[in-house]
Regions:
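Short, surface-exposed coil-to-beta transition loops
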Residues: 10, 68-73, 97-102
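Short amphipathic alpha-helical signal-transduction/dimerization elements
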Residues: 27, 141-149
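Hydrophobic pocket/interface hotspot
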Residues: 22, 32, 57, 75, ...
Length: 149
Protein backbone atom coordinates (compact mmCIF):
# COMPACT_ATOMS: atom_id res chain seq x y z
CA UNK A 1 0.00 0.00 0.00
CA UNK A 2 1.26 3.48 -0.88
CA UNK A 3 1.94 6.16 1.70
CA UNK A 4 1.77 9.95 1.73
CA UNK A 5 3.53 12.45 3.99
CA UNK A 6 2.17 16.01 3.88
CA UNK A 7 4.37 19.04 4.45
CA UNK A 8 4.35 22.77 3.83
CA UNK A 9 6.70 25.71 4.04
CA UNK A 10 6.71 29.45 3.41
CA UNK A 11 9.60 31.54 2.09
CA UNK A 12 9.64 35.35 2.26
CA UNK A 13 12.01 37.71 0.49
CA UNK A 14 12.21 41.49 0.11
CA UNK A 15 13.80 43.06 -2.98
CA UNK A 16 14.32 46.65 -4.03
CA UNK A 17 12.79 45.94 -7.45
CA UNK A 18 9.17 46.66 -8.42
CA UNK A 19 6.68 43.76 -8.53
CA UNK A 20 6.59 44.04 -12.34
CA UNK A 21 10.31 43.28 -12.52
CA UNK A 22 10.04 40.31 -10.16
CA UNK A 23 7.00 38.97 -12.02
CA UNK A 24 8.93 39.14 -15.32
CA UNK A 25 11.60 36.88 -13.81
CA UNK A 26 8.88 34.18 -13.76
CA UNK A 27 6.91 35.16 -16.88
CA UNK A 28 9.72 35.72 -19.41
CA UNK A 29 11.52 32.59 -20.57
CA UNK A 30 14.93 34.24 -21.03
CA UNK A 31 14.71 35.92 -17.60
CA UNK A 32 13.65 32.66 -15.93
CA UNK A 33 16.48 30.72 -17.55
CA UNK A 34 18.92 32.92 -15.57
CA UNK A 35 17.77 31.42 -12.28
CA UNK A 36 15.74 28.25 -13.04
CA UNK A 37 18.11 26.01 -14.96
CA UNK A 38 19.46 23.61 -12.34
CA UNK A 39 22.43 23.82 -10.00
CA UNK A 40 26.09 23.88 -11.14
CA UNK A 41 26.91 20.66 -13.02
CA UNK A 42 23.28 20.09 -14.08
CA UNK A 43 22.98 18.49 -17.54
CA UNK A 44 19.61 19.51 -19.00
CA UNK A 45 17.65 16.80 -20.84
CA UNK A 46 14.30 18.49 -21.50
CA UNK A 47 12.86 21.98 -21.05
CA UNK A 48 9.55 23.53 -22.05
CA UNK A 49 7.99 26.85 -21.07
CA UNK A 50 4.36 27.97 -21.54
CA UNK A 51 3.63 30.65 -18.94
CA UNK A 52 -0.14 31.13 -19.04
CA UNK A 53 -3.09 29.75 -17.09
CA UNK A 54 -3.29 26.09 -18.11
CA UNK A 55 0.22 26.28 -19.59
CA UNK A 56 2.90 23.77 -18.77
CA UNK A 57 6.58 24.06 -17.85
CA UNK A 58 9.00 21.15 -17.66
CA UNK A 59 12.65 20.78 -16.73
CA UNK A 60 14.51 17.50 -16.47
CA UNK A 61 18.13 16.54 -16.32
CA UNK A 62 21.01 14.85 -14.57
CA UNK A 63 22.76 16.35 -11.55
CA UNK A 64 26.54 16.24 -11.07
CA UNK A 65 26.18 13.24 -8.71
CA UNK A 66 24.20 11.26 -11.31
CA UNK A 67 20.69 11.76 -9.91
CA UNK A 68 18.04 12.48 -12.60
CA UNK A 69 15.19 14.84 -11.70
CA UNK A 70 12.09 15.86 -13.64
CA UNK A 71 9.84 18.86 -12.84
CA UNK A 72 6.42 18.96 -14.56
CA UNK A 73 4.34 22.05 -13.74
CA UNK A 74 0.91 23.40 -14.73
CA UNK A 75 0.08 27.07 -14.10
CA UNK A 76 -3.34 27.27 -12.41
CA UNK A 77 -3.83 31.00 -11.71
CA UNK A 78 -1.86 34.03 -12.84
CA UNK A 79 -2.56 37.64 -11.88
CA UNK A 80 0.18 39.72 -13.55
CA UNK A 81 2.54 41.40 -11.09
CA UNK A 82 0.60 39.97 -8.10
CA UNK A 83 0.18 36.19 -7.97
CA UNK A 84 1.23 32.89 -9.57
CA UNK A 85 -0.34 29.58 -8.50
CA UNK A 86 0.97 26.34 -9.94
CA UNK A 87 0.97 22.63 -9.24
CA UNK A 88 3.78 20.27 -10.09
CA UNK A 89 4.97 16.69 -9.99
CA UNK A 90 8.59 15.75 -9.24
CA UNK A 91 10.29 12.55 -10.35
CA UNK A 92 13.62 11.31 -9.01
CA UNK A 93 15.44 8.70 -11.10
CA UNK A 94 12.17 7.95 -12.92
CA UNK A 95 10.05 7.51 -9.78
CA UNK A 96 7.28 9.97 -8.86
CA UNK A 97 8.24 11.33 -5.43
CA UNK A 98 5.86 14.24 -4.88
CA UNK A 99 2.88 16.29 -5.99
CA UNK A 100 2.84 19.91 -4.83
CA UNK A 101 0.96 23.17 -5.10
CA UNK A 102 2.69 26.52 -4.72
CA UNK A 103 1.49 30.11 -4.54
CA UNK A 104 3.77 33.09 -5.14
CA UNK A 105 2.46 36.44 -3.93
CA UNK A 106 4.12 39.72 -4.92
CA UNK A 107 3.26 42.79 -2.87
CA UNK A 108 4.63 46.33 -3.25
CA UNK A 109 6.56 47.21 -0.10
CA UNK A 110 8.87 50.14 0.72
CA UNK A 111 9.47 50.96 -2.94
CA UNK A 112 10.28 47.33 -3.76
CA UNK A 113 8.62 43.92 -3.57
CA UNK A 114 7.77 41.46 -0.85
CA UNK A 115 7.66 37.91 -2.25
CA UNK A 116 5.87 35.20 -0.26
CA UNK A 117 6.05 31.65 -1.62
CA UNK A 118 3.88 29.05 0.14
CA UNK A 119 4.13 25.41 -0.90
CA UNK A 120 2.10 22.35 0.11
CA UNK A 121 3.65 19.02 -0.79
CA UNK A 122 2.52 15.42 -0.77
CA UNK A 123 5.58 13.17 -0.55
CA UNK A 124 4.80 9.72 -1.90
CA UNK A 125 5.50 6.09 -1.11
CA UNK A 126 8.23 6.40 1.48
CA UNK A 127 10.13 9.31 -0.06
CA UNK A 128 11.79 11.13 2.85
CA UNK A 129 12.21 14.75 1.80
CA UNK A 130 14.01 15.69 5.06
CA UNK A 131 13.73 19.39 4.18
CA UNK A 132 15.50 19.16 0.83
CA UNK A 133 12.54 20.70 -1.08
CA UNK A 134 12.51 23.76 1.16
CA UNK A 135 16.31 24.00 0.94
CA UNK A 136 16.24 23.74 -2.86
CA UNK A 137 13.42 26.27 -3.17
CA UNK A 138 15.31 28.72 -0.94
CA UNK A 139 18.34 28.30 -3.21
CA UNK A 140 16.19 28.97 -6.30
CA UNK A 141 14.61 32.08 -4.79
CA UNK A 142 18.04 33.39 -3.75
CA UNK A 143 19.26 32.74 -7.31
CA UNK A 144 16.21 34.60 -8.64
CA UNK A 145 17.12 37.56 -6.42
CA UNK A 146 20.68 37.60 -7.80
CA UNK A 147 19.32 37.50 -11.36
CA UNK A 148 17.43 40.75 -10.72
CA UNK A 149 20.66 42.69 -10.12
Amino acid sequence: MGSVVHASFTITRHWKHAPQRVFQAFADEAAKRKWFAGPPGFEQHEKSFDFREGGRETLSGKHAGGMVTAFDCVYRDIVPNERIVYSYVMHLDGKKISVSQACIELTPENGGTKLVLTEYGDYLDGYDDAGSREHGTNWLIDTLGKSLE
